[in-house]
Amino acid sequence: MASATRQFARAATRATRNGFAIAPRQVIRQQGRRYYSSEPAQKSSSAWIWLTGAAVAGGAGYYFYGNSASSATAKVFNPSKEDYQKVYNEIAARLEEKDDYDDGSYGPVLVRLAWHASGTYDKETGTGGSNGATMRFAPESDHGANAGLAAARDFLQPVKEKFPWITYSDLWILAGVCAIQEMLGPAIPYRPGRSDRDVSGCTPDGRLPDASKRQDHLRGIFGRMGFNDQEIVALSGAHALGRCHTDRSGYSGPWTFSPTVLTNDYFRLLVEEKWQWKKWNGPAQYEDKSTKSLMMLPSDIALIEDKKFKPWVEKYAKDNDAFFKDFSNVVLRLFELGVPFAQGTENQRWTFKPTHQE
């Protein structure tokens, strides 16, 4: 049922993406929350031992050895675009099959995993970023900003086991790319080449945005990663997806009426709706005056209060194509932060075909 409802919502969004009007929608059902353990250790195989090898022009080489007496020669497997497309398709198939999560989709939490894995980058020290997948370990997995992301890591563990040659780092980012595209967002070019690190690579707490803060905080956090005002606003458009949970961030509710479809509705709602403080026992957040079913965070409202942020909000509210173009460009940059890609691969990114275009 959730899958059928999600498909209907996506079809309706395709037809009305340029004809948005703020009005009460069908009530979004809030699924029962599930609790997840961190992903299990990767199973070893009696037949193969996989080792990450040297980086090559299109990604990484993976060496494996047979354990039979007649197989003494190491072989190298260099995954191609087609191999990564198979991983993409597997993630997309699981997104369609596993519809027992928020609003019928794990898509938003996969985007959040990729975002939080990348958003720890510090341009001054060169630490953090999407290389390493260090959120597999405490203390990074226990950072408050990462609460609830075990759900995304557990969702991807069977994919990792089916394709053991892909690193967790590359898998998490590919999952973010897949989720954005499968939720009708823009194409996000992808470049493999990330390696996994151990617990020593965990980043310090406090590098991700704090939803309770406003414009100065946003500029400090995003500026550390190298983003300007326009890029901060474009990246914030990811809040069109998903919802907040009281047992994670403390906040509650979705930002938009279609939290499993990426559109510019987040910006339209910011500009066109009236927002008021929510009267409840939780942390300070806003609710829409019309239906009281949507929410905005203090960091969201900061985008329309700041005179330099607001023009970009207004631009994206009027032009979904402009938002998609800028969002794709800045997400590509975000997902590559901190990755020591092999020289000569700058223009060797791949774009994968979404399943809804097949």
Curated annotation (Swiss-Prot):
GO terms for cellular component: mitochondrial intermembrane space; mitochondrial matrix. Residues 194-213 are annotated as: Disordered. It catalyses: 2 Fe(II)-[cytochrome c] + H2O2 + 2 H(+) = 2 Fe(III)-[cytochrome c] + 2 H2O. The active site is at H116 (proton acceptor), W255 (tryptophan radical intermediate). It is found in: Mitochondrion matrix; Mitochondrion intermembrane space. Its EC number is 1.11.1.5. InterPro entries: Ccp1-like (IPR044831), Haem_peroxidase (IPR002016), Haem_peroxidase_sf (IPR010255), Peroxidase_I (IPR002207), Peroxidases_AS (IPR019794), Peroxidases_heam-ligand_BS (IPR019793). It comes from the Eukaryota. Belongs to the peroxidase family. Cytochrome c peroxidase subfamily. PANTHER family: CYTOCHROME C PEROXIDASE, MITOCHONDRIAL, THYLAKOID LUMENAL 29 KDA PROTEIN, CHLOROPLASTIC-RELATED. This is Cytochrome c peroxidase, mitochondrial. It comes from Gibberella zeae (strain ATCC MYA-4620 / CBS 123657 / FGSC 9075 / NRRL 31084 / PH-1). The gene is CCP1.
